[in-house]
């Protein structure tokens, strides 16, 4: 098992919007509200930036859009299927992902920062080109205000690989070469090292500021429950030290004043 728990400084993504107001995704724990970036968003960014989705094939069957999977195109020879699939074209076949992510949850309690914007430049251009008085006929020119919550903060997420499952597709008794398995894992790890995320025009340097992990035998997010950062300070506990001293686990961090 290859396991990592990561601290990074990233923007939250957004849930449902109400009119022109957008809210960041949040979770409720320990009696408090924390902003998040969903594991689906994290996984999609990693798969896309790593090139793992470069060979993705998609089919639409009875208005259902899904990854294409056949006996000739499966997880052993298609990188895009490494993250798991369910295909219902003929018989339903399901393959679980060989790696799992958690949501990236803020280390500190959510503080609402609302940003207000409008499309004044576009509306002014339309009004000028069509002889409209913007002040008198703002609606006709398409002038529209909008607002959204904003959160960029330290967040924690974990990623765990089941190395025995990488490149293996039991639905078709197929398995990738060892070199292909190594390449897939390295592509994902290298992408996490240099990850960038975009939401509402914000480009985040989502590289790990601090990372705990290594290779061990525990098939779970091994450090997820013992890595606790509050107000940019890591809580060093006996349990954290004990786990770092087991097997081939290490800690690394960037001295960047974050």
What role is predicted for each listed range?
Residues 1-258:
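RNA-binding basic/glycine-rich loop and surface signature characteristic of RAMP-family CRISPR effectors
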């Amino acid at each position: 098992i290859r396991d990592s728990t990561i601290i990074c400084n990233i923007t939250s993504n957004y849930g449902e919007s109400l009119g022109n107001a957008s809210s960041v995704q949040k979770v409720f724990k320990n009696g408090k509200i924390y902003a998040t970036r969903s594991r689906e968003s994290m996984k999609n960014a990693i798969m896309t930036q790593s090139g793992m989705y470069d060979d993705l094939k998609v089919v639409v069957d009875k208005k259902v859009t899904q990854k294409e999977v056949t006996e000739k195109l499966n997880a052993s020879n298609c990188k895009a299927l490494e993250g798991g699939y369910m295909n219902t074209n003929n018989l339903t076949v399901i393959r679980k992902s060989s790696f799992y992510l958690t949501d990236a949850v803020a280390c500190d309690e959510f503080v609402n920062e609302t940003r207000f914007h409008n499309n004044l430049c576009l509306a002014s251009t339309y009004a000028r080109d069509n002889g409209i008085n913007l002040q008198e006929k703002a609606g006709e020119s398409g002038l529209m205000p909008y607002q959204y919550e904003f959160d960029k903060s330290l967040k924690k997420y974990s990623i765990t690989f089941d190395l025995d499952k990488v490149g293996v597709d039991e639905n078709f008794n197929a398995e990738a070469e060892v070199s292909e398995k190594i390449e897939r894992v390295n592509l994902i790890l290298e992408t996490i090292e240099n990850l960038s995320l975009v939401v509402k025009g914000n480009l985040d340097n989502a590289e790990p500021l601090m990372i705990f992990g290594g290779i061990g035998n525990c098939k779970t997010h091994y450090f997820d429950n013992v890595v606790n950062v509050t107000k940019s300070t890591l809580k060093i506990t006996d349990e954290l030290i004990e786990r770092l001293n087991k097997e081939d686990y290490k800690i690394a961090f960037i001295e960047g004043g974050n």
